[in-house]
Amino acid sequence: MTDQSRAQPQTATSTITGIFALLTAKPGVTRERVMAIMPAEIRATVKLYLEGKIREWYAREDGRGAIFLLNAKDVAEASSIMESLPLAHEDMLDHQYIPVGPLMPLGLLLGSPPAKQ
């Protein structure tokens, strides 16, 4: 399930270029349960990548999940993408979403005034 309360707020002045989705196995979910669904999860993930919805993905070093960089305009779109995957259908993962965009202070190098917050 998605925990929207942990999502970072989005401001109207920011430019969102992607959404990080941090997926963590829920407490009590065993490796065996995850591995039983993993072939379908991998196929679905590759399909989303080939459709341009997933830009990058990584395994978490702690072995508890994955981190995706999604081509999504907002958290709602990112959530829709992640909820389409088999492990989400089985309610095995917690999701956290973090919108990201350009490092706005770099505009100072171009002589642009900083965006007002």
Question: What does each of the following model-derived ranges do?
Answer:
Residues 2-117:
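Conserved, structured core segments of small domains
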